């Protein structure tokens, strides 16, 4: 399934440089859009984006989809439409192999909902390959985790959780008696904390809309963290007040508690405590897709991230770049890697849009420099909390409505890179009108 001008030559008969981007997450889609505008429109390159889904949803929104605070269908962006608007091509498929010698990637067959093959195994040729397939949750091999926990790695998983949550409330209402629902969240990083806060707000909304047989007090949320505190990536002056706020909101916070076993009834902790839970979410740790570890001679680390240099080229093949969560990129001379954050992928996409244009022109590539602008964590409609980095003031804490505005602006920045300022303003107005005529929680 392709959109755009077919073939490898432009209207002047000059062979175009073939750029293939695998993965349409925040970074991959931003890069395809920028390269399409910069190189695809002028016929200097043929830009192709490959993804296993037809639509894009900004991953930091998944906890809102899971709670029902956001309808995924209203926030998804169709890759075909974005490709048509921005002079690149889209091909639906899942990457399964790589032939470095002939410069081709292999895609798995496509199937319809009945299991019929609608497209056979295919290959796509490239001159420059960019891999941006993101990461998934790392269950660290914990027995039972894969069978009994949900992982908020994609919109389908978030929607599945939302449906199960709604079913619990609808079932209790139909039975007509007061019930208790236990939810356990493993991992108190940003995703775990944000989901806990959203679920606490969702409990109040369910009751307001008449689903009151599971009262807000009877939605028992347990947040489990193996480390000593919540939000370990943020300073203690930020994370400790967040933990206090969660406890005040009725969330049970258990730090220093490693999960050793998950079963249908709940989770077993290393300290011998058993946490009962009907709904279980694993949000601890990340790892890149397993297939990356078997791609040609490319080197990966222990969590399957492709090892890249400061130019974001893989260490074994200069024709292949990788960025975002799936890449282990050195962070200057710090001895650490660039953190797996949305802001890093955004910066790397902008860097690669310029670097790949230089590569086509035969010019040397610059080195990527990551700039940490701070971290923000949403606490649902109660606001947000986090740190911002300034050149003069260093790191400083923000919270409440101001932090919430900064948090929302991150999403608007992502939208602006995809649509431009005027269309983002139009979307903001449409969102505001929608909030005045729709329920605050998805109830279907």
Regions flagged by a language model, labelled:
Residues 179-234, 241, 252-254, 338-356, ...:
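Rossmann-like dinucleotide-binding core of oxidoreductases
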Residues 44-46, 86, 90-109, 200-310, ...:
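A Rossmann-like FAD-binding core segment of flavoenzymes
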Residues 13-97, 190-234, 281:
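Beta1-alpha1 glycine-rich phosphate/pyrophosphate-binding loop at the start
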Residues 8-15, 90-184, 281:
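FAD-binding core/adjacent interface of flavoenzyme oxidoreductases
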Residues 62-68, 146-150, 238, 296-299, ...:
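Short glycine-enriched, charge-decorated loop/helix-capping segments at active-site entrances
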Residues 148-176, 265-268, 274-347, 354:
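FAD-site-proximal beta/loop scaffold in flavoenzymes
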Residues 16, 353-444:
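C-terminal, flexible cofactor-proximal segment of oxidoreductases
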